[in-house]
């Protein structure tokens, strides 16, 4: 996004990042970030803390001309609230790469709301992670974590199982 001249404002659970951003906050800063965003890109895990974090109240905080892009997990957004917001606000747009009912291989895709009937929605089949070099990057990160472990250091990116249990 920076290549397009974007100023990056981010929130996460810690309020810290090693990434180059103009602002980093915690989930307590989410309302402020939503109100200022021209483009909101969701790329966070679905945990107890993030399930349904974007609902009607949060969508109303956003600019009427904002673009919401979800490349994370569908459950982060209230499906009905997003559909109604898109329907009622034609200048608000969404790029949706992850869906609320993702079918097992060979089964039909379905939605509870007719998103594809809206002119302000662009959908893709949950394949945004498939980009050139992504598997090599993942393999490199895994190898670096093995190296850390073998040296007696803590691996990077450790998650707490209890944050995900009973999602």
State each model region's role.
Residues 14-111:
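Rossmann-like adenosine-cofactor binding region
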Residues 5, 10-15:
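N-terminal Rossmann-fold cofactor-binding loop
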Residues 5, 23, 164:
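Glycine-rich NAD(P)-binding loop of Rossmann-like domains
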Residues 1-2:
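Surface-exposed amphipathic alpha-helices with a cationic face
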Residues 9, 25, 122:
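General small-molecule cofactor/ligand-binding pocket signal
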Residues 12-13, 41, 121, 125:
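Generic signal for short, ordered secondary-structure residues
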Residues 65, 72-167:
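Rossmann-like dinucleotide-binding domain for NAD(H)/NADP(H)
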């Amino acid at each position: 996004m920076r290549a397009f001249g974007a100023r990056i404002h981010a929130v996460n659970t810690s309020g810290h990042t090693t990434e180059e951003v103009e602002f980093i906050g915690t989930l307590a800063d989410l309302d402020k970030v939503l109100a200022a965003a021209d483009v909101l890109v969701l790329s966070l895990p679905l945990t107890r803390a993030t399930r349904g974090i974007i609902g009607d109240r949060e969508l109303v905080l956003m600019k009427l001309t904002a673009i919401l892009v979800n490349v994370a997990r569908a459950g982060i957004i209230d499906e009905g609230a997003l559909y109604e917001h898109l329907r009622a606000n034609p200048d608000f747009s969404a790029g949706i790469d992850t869906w609320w009912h993702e079918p097992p291989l060979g089964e039909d895709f379905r939605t509870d709301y007719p998103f594809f009937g809206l002119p302000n929605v662009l959908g893709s089949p949950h394949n945004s992670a498939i980009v050139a070099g992504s598997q090599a990057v993942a393999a490199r990160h895994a190898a670096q974590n093995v190296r850390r472990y073998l040296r007696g250091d803590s691996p990077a990116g450790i998650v707490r199982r209890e944050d995900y249990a009973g999602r």
